Amino acid sequence: MSRGPEEVNRLTENTYRNVVEQFNPGLRNLINLGKNYEKAVNAMILAGKAYYDGVAKIGEIATGSPVSTELGHVLIEISSTHKKLNETLDENFKKFHKEIIHELEKKTELDVKYMNATLKRYQAEHRNKLDSLEKSQAELKKIRRKSQGGRNALKYEHKEIEYVETVTSRQSEIQKFIADGCKEALLEEKRRFCFLVDKHCSFASHIHRYHLQSAELLNSKLPRWQETCCDATKVPEKIMNMIEEIKTPISTPVSGTPQPSPMTERSKMIGKDYDTLSKYSPKMPPAPSVKAYTSPLIDMFNNPATAGQSAEKTNNSTANTGDDPSLQRSVSVATGLNMMKKQKVKTIFPHTAGNNKTLLSFAQGDVLTLLIPEEKDGWLYGEHDTTKVRGWFPSSYTKLLEENMKEAMSVPTPSSAPVRSISTVDLTEKSSVVIPPPDYLECLSMGATSDKRADAAKIPSTSTFKAPVPRPDATSTSPSDSNGTAKPPFLSGENPFATVKLRPTVTNDRSAPIIR
């Protein structure tokens, strides 16, 4: 492809301008990016060192395990190997800074000045040569005009030949200058790209050597590392022997073998009965989270003798329940009412469930079967005998059915353990209870407990109990209470209820019993 001198000259100037305006600014940007690259690699090396320090710490933990000791040593070795590779990488990147970044910084500043000066020098020489050629061409034109119309044609012809030779030689010089300048400009450009490639090839050789060393090091250790973790269920032989010894108990003489506890068979039978009952027990929804509300008309069903004292009993019931929680129940386990036969209750107030599907609706006088005999926060769970619908309902809206009460009276108390008073009859309301005579003290223990004294002291002085007629052999002097009245013998700390015959009671809301 042939090009004219002017086109080649433009190529030369453009080459110099590309080096000055594009290559050198690109090198400056490359230097900044290289510095960022160095920072990132240094941060990666530091992060890797911290990471593999953590791996080594976990390996130290594993070395304390009887089955993972070898794995712990492998983790420590992996940590040290990778830290060594990171140190080698750090050394290679120090060469990256020294051979590339530092050299580029040094060359770029000098090269900008050099290329600007070279371009200006080329342009100046090219302009001088063009001026000389143009001057010679102008002289040649003058001589040719003179030789055409003058007398001395031979004289001007000789000068014309000389100027033609001068113009021709100067044109050759310009063409040679343009060609040499273009070649020099292209070579200057190539030298700069070659320098950049050479520096990166040198760094690549260092990285290649680093990767070869890393591959050789990892290939020598990786199979052994993988072998230690190929089977996670493998247990060392020493540990297996220990486990087998634990599995195989040492034989003991027959005489030393303990006999099974008699409570074991009882527990098995109880558990079997419980499983049978739980298998056929109804699946019920959870009890309502709110406390069951008490009927506002509940006092209407109390005895007339106690109807006037409902407010006082409500206040006293709160204080009494704090002393002994077992007195809250009107029907205890000892009465036999909590046996497996399902109890029935009769509703005394209507109840509407509303939008709550877990509650049971009923009218006054309906009969319900209790599926769960125990109350939960004032709620009972049962089934309507007519509609066969199940749900929760307030216990204060029902009372025990008559037939259930008769059965409860006929069931004997099977408990052999000492049972405290089961009835929650308010003793202040009973004026017909007869106090036993003082000779009852003979069958009692001489050391009365302090809690019995406290219970006796809680009985108000206005009690309607009839004081017993003192026997002649009784103590003539009896202590007096605070208001000056004679203190009955049973208030001296003895049990006043041992001979009291209690009536069966039915409690609707656990606050006021109904005396039958």
UniProtKB/Swiss-Prot annotation:
PROSITE patterns, alphabetized: IMD, SH3
Highest rank taxon of the organism: Eukaryota
Spans annotated as Disordered: 303-328, 454-516
Coiled coil ranges: 115-148
Sites bearing Phosphothreonine, chain numbering: T248, T257, T413
Post-translational modification: Phosphorylated on tyrosine in response to insulin.
Principal subcellular localisation of the protein: cytoplasm
Domain notes: The IMD domain is predicted to have a helical structure. It may induce actin bundling and filopodia formation.
Protein name: BAR/IMD domain-containing adapter protein 2-like 1
Organism: Rattus norvegicus (Rat)
Encoding gene, per UniProt annotation: Baiap2l1
